[in-house]
């Protein structure tokens, strides 16, 4: 019986690799500096495996919207704000960091966050995962991952 169970696990990993091996935004939920995010973004793009945005995803976590095989869970909440400097410049908007975030978003989302000033201020503005899927055309994550 244990052999059958082990075989089923292996087969499901082969048949459903995107679901069983999907990386998630969980460990990046609270944002942070680009050095923390870029290796994970590069890895996700290189592997082509599904990258799942779920739960709370703020600041640079939204960069994962630019991953080539990204999906978003309907229950996710994405929080957007302008990029900013470090140290004494932490409260100063940084055009380069802001542009990096904009470049990660598809055209519809980019137009929306720009038109509504989401990346022109340091305070968070949120968009639900359901809205990211329905209005901005991002892929919905398969259930069960």
Q: What are the language-model segments listed below?
A:
Residues 6-14:
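Bacterial N-terminal signal peptides
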Residues 13, 74-84, 133-145:
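Short, Lys/Arg-enriched charge-dense amphipathic segments
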Residues 15-22:
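Sec/Tat signal peptide C-region and signal peptidase I cleavage site
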Residues 23-76, 80-86:
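Cleft-lining beta-strand/loop regions that shape enzyme active-site pockets
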Residues 25-27, 35-52, 89-145:
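Charged, glycine-interspersed solvent-exposed loop segments at helix/strand-loop junctions
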